Amino acid sequence: MGSIDEVKKESAGETLGRLLKGEIKDEELKKLIKFQFEKRLQWGYKSSHQEQLSFNLDFIKSLKKMEMSGEIETMNKETYELPSEFLEAVFGKTVKQSMCYFTHESATIDEAEEAAHELYCERAQIKDGQTVLDIGCGQGGLVLYIAQKYKNCHVTGLTNSKAQVNYLLKQAEKLGLTNVDAILADVTQYESDKTYDRLLMIEAIEHMKNLQLFMKKLSTWMTKESLLFVDHVCHKTFAHFFEAVDEDDWYSGFIFPPGCATILAANSLLYFQDDVSVVDHWVVNGMHMARSVDIWRKALDKNMEAAKEILLPGLGGSHETVNGVVTHIRTFCMGGYEQFSMNNGDEWMVAQLLFKKK
């Protein structure tokens, strides 16, 4: 019996109310989340290949009519603007908030973070002496990794979060790195005549909408010899916005505010080659992501009291608000596990593509 048969009918508001009051135990929460993803699969899979192709192409065409990005400011406030001490208590040593890559069963989160950084460098063909731009760099773990490994590279991180810029520059100073820069900007608004040998975008393109315009913008920062490496979460067959699939979907809007996240199909970016052309294309099994978020949740649970104390001052001393933030993060992690472990990691996964300028 699947989750769809096991979940009792209640409104999205009722489910969220119980969740925020702490009335839903983890086992029930797993079933409730899995139910939502099973509904998403029913929504996304079509009965014939022609129907599937038409459905997918309609989505691609719809993106081309939209603004370049989604509601990034809303998402930043609700998802990414957390104290660095909190992030350090939950994530690994490079504070990587995206898929980690587990090369063996006993790999630690620190080893998996490093392996992911190494995989990016290998597939992006990073070489010493290059100029590198990491777009949506987060806390700067990849920037610092490249700057340390390739001493003659000049590595720049771009983010619209002041806290992330400050964290990155502080870590670079601690490490004695002089080949690191940070740009505080919204990538969709940022203009520059500068070009880079390598552009990297790790799990950030999900927050874009009009990918035709966005890829054109990225191409202006490339020369004929440059390469663009994009890593994004995806579904293997169809794309979808991370928004409610029906009126009873409590999960999607709770995890990301509406308009903030687009889950592409594994091949979606192949339809946006007006200004760049694909050089290589890979997928990474979803179990790497599932294992990552599961480790983050366990670290949060282990450090729960300390984590709440870290959050309290920045949230107005409100224990209720702190509990809400923690519930959101735990639910995000549990949801990520259910999503990316479906079909043994062969349903939702991570796509990686390498492009050159046309």
From Swiss-Prot:
EC assignment: the record states 2.1.1.122
Q: In which pathway does it act?
A: Alkaloid biosynthesis
Positions that bind S-adenosyl-L-methionine: 98, 136, 160, 164, 186-187, 202
Q: In which tissues is it expressed?
A: Expressed in roots, leaves, stems and flower buds.
* Entry-linked InterPro entries: SAM-dependent_MTases_sf
Q: Hydrolase: present as a keyword of the record?
A: no
Task: Give the function comment from the record.
Answer: Involved in the biosynthesis of protopine and benzophenanthridine alkaloids. Catalyzes the conversion of the protoberberine alkaloids stylopine, canadine, and tetrahydropalmatine to their corresponding N-methylated derivatives. No activity with dimethoxytetrahydroisoquinoline, methylisoquinolinediol, norlaudanosoline, (R,S)-tetrahydroxyberbine, (S)-scoulerine or (R,S)-pavine as substrates.
Assembly with partners or alone: Homodimer.
According to UniProt, the name of this protein is (S)-tetrahydroprotoberberine N-methyltransferase
